[in-house]
Structure formats: structure tokens, C-alpha cells
Amino acid sequence: RPGPVLVDVTKDVTAAECEYSPRVPKPVERITASIKEEDIDKAVTLIKKAKKPYVFVGGGAVISEASDELKKFVEKVDAPVCDSLMGKGAFDGSNERYTGMLGMHGVSECDLLIVVGARFSDRVTGNAKKFAKNAKILQFDVDAAEINKNVRTDAHVLGDAKEILKRINDKLDNQDHSDWMEHIKSYKLDYPMRYNRDILNGPLIMEKIYE
């Protein structure tokens, strides 16, 4: 009948020695064939038109090891950055542009949400119909199934995040959104993260590690 199955392997089998010819695994090539130049151009156009861009980083940026390209991209766009739980580590958490994890109401003021390798889970969007309702959405993702899955996008680029960011960086001039960045900084000053510094706790430990 259906149920748990235990496979018991004897010690003489697990400790046995044998000869074999190892196979050297082939390197996995990044998916670049799916990246269309017209999609890159459309993304660049949207970025240039934006006045209040916001970059949302997901696990795809971590998997593609896109940290360097992401940092350069964010500086060129001149935008604040947030991330998902899976996207943590792709962007420096001590950088002044970093605003923490994306919340359900944290994207209400941006006019362009640039999504790098994130999948719009319900813990991010809440009510998807009301998510980032004042913004156009530009999504970069390697998985076609994630495009327009939970949230409709205005434009997207399908492919490896590292390669997408590299190509856009090559075409994008430095943008100036100093007023927008000052506005974001004012929020960080008005609503700082507070925690008890007299006892050992997670945020304090991470702060010391960053230092």
C-alpha cells in the first residue's frame, strides 16, 4: 500500500571501493539567444523616460552572479533598490540606495518598477490588481513562464540577468534622479530601523558583520 519507503544500504556496499572513469561536466552556458535587441532598446527607452525609477532585485540576480552589473546599472539609472528574500546579497545592504525588502505598499510612488529576476509572489504583491498601480513595470527574467504570470508587465527582457544588465549598461547614459533619491533618503531618516542595542539580536549582529 502507498506510504513511506525505507531503502537500507548495507555497510559493505557503502564502504566498497571500485574503479571508474570520471566524466568532466560541461560548463553551462548562459542563455543569451533569447535576449532580443529590440527588447533591450525598449527597456532603455522606458528607463530614460522614468522620473521615479525603483529597482526590485530577486533570486535570479543571485543565481546569475550579477552583483557587479547590478551595481553599475543602479548607479546609471540613479535609483533606490529593494529586494526579495531570495534576492538578498545581490546588492550591498549597506549601500545608501538600499531600502530593504520590498513591502506591499513600498512601490506606491515609483513610476517605473524595474524587476531583476523576481517572480512577484503574493507576499510581495498582496492584491496584485493594486500592486504598483502608478508605475510601469519592466521585468528581466530567464524563465518565460514568470513573465506576466502574477503581474502584467509593460515591457520585459527574457534571458540571463547578468547578460541583460550588461547589455543595458552598454546602451544607457547616466540618469539624474537626485530629487527622487533625496525624497527616498528623507523616508529613511523619518522612519529609521530601531532595535535594542543593549542585548544581542539579529539586526545588531548583521550590522557588526557589515562594519
Which residues fall in each region the model found?
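Gly-rich Lys/Arg/Thr-decorated short loops/hinges at beta-loop-alpha junctions or inter-strand turns
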Residues: 17-28, 183-193
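Short, solvent-exposed amphipathic alpha-helical segments in soluble enzyme
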Residues: 22-24, 67-78, 128-133, 155-156
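Glycine-rich, acidic loop regions that bind phosphate or pyrophosphate groups
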Residues: 83-183
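Active-site diphosphate/adenylate-binding microenvironment
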Residues: 183-211
